Amino acid sequence: MSSCIFCNIISKEIDGKIVYEDDQWLAFDDINPQAPIHVLIVPREHIPTLNDLKENHRDIIGNMGVVINKIAEIKNVKDPGFRVVINCNTAGGQLVYHLHVHLLGGRQMTWPPG
């Protein structure tokens, strides 16, 4: 078992409520939701932070928007809308060092987020 909880969910060593998966991405409901809809979208490849993206990740990241759009559709938040967040490193609020996107919806979002 890996020390990365997201890698363990990807490998199915730990259960996660899977919302979507393809050959590059896996999405699952957050166990500590900050909104009625809170999905974590993670690349299957272990990339620690946004700062660790390299040229060879273009294809994965290029598909990210399409995947987010599919998940918003699955969760019925495309309309009226949703928020997407990527935290990077400690000051950015990142707790799990496996790049991931938060999709939040199901309520009115406020600004600034905090």
Give the predicted meaning of each segment.
Residues 1-114:
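HIT superfamily nucleotide-processing domains
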